[in-house]
Amino acid sequence: MQRRTFIKNTALSAVAVSAFGFIEFDGKKYTGDCETTTDILGPFYRPGSPVQNNLAIKGEPGEFIELSGIIRHRDCTTPYQKAKIELWHCDAKGVYDNSSPDFRYRGTTYSDEKGHYSFNTILPVPYDVGDGSIRPAHFHLMITAEGYQPLVTQLYFTGDVNIKKDVYAASPKAKRRILNVQNLNNGTKKVVYDVSMVENLTVETATIDKLTGIYTDKADKTKSVEFFKSDNALWRKNEVFGAKFDYTGNNTFEYPGMPPGMYRKLYFEILVSGNIQLTVDYMNSNATKHTVVYLKEK
């Protein structure tokens, strides 16, 4: 994957782009109608990145940039201390480090008592995903805070001509995540992204679209399941219409309203090949656990 275009931006100031919507006064304080959406973890996420917020590598090409922001509670005002923030992105050639022990351009940090976090790294670049389409430059973030659903998201940058052609970046829900870039006097850049955590996240429309389709049982090619989107939710097709599944975080959907002791969970994994693997775990009424693995080819 090759670098296609460097981001050029002449913004005069950094703007804090928050992942929440309208603020309203409840008679005592301002509270937020927190509009937060999440993505499914893509093929380039690696757990266990080291605790480090300086990801820049000496001698490597790239434009230096600082990403900073504030993590807040559900009320959109109270800082959240010790939220875990994981950042990962490609290098200046559009390549991700998916296996080396160095965890290049990958790091973890924690918010302080004021909810503040920051990373110093390089500006990622657009890259060819392999089929001729170009993904706009972006940061990947995963934010984990006790009491809330983990937030997985992607941050884009104003001025990137590839945004309008990308189904994820061009989504109306992504507008708050297209960040203005401040050019600092020392020649580096800065972007700001604030987040308010919520208990239940809405999955991006484009993400639901990616998960829909027919999945074939890996152990028995004669069996398959089909998923479709309705009212921006994921449904499994049946002989009448379908069964709706709720997103519960960490790439997992669950069928709601199951009796105690019973469950049906869907875990999606987007593979580097572009294929999507689905693991279905369920417990039936006789307390027997079942696991079936399916695959949807690209």
Task: Please place each PLM-identified region on the residue numbering.
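Beta-strand secondary-structure signal
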Residues: 66-68, 118, 140, 192-194, ...
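Extracellular beta-sheet/turn segments enriched in Thr/Pro/Gly and aliphatic residues
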Residues: 53-58, 163-202
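Peripheral terminal and inter-domain segments
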Residues: 196-298
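Beta-strand-dominated extracellular/periplasmic modules and repeats
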Residues: 27-167
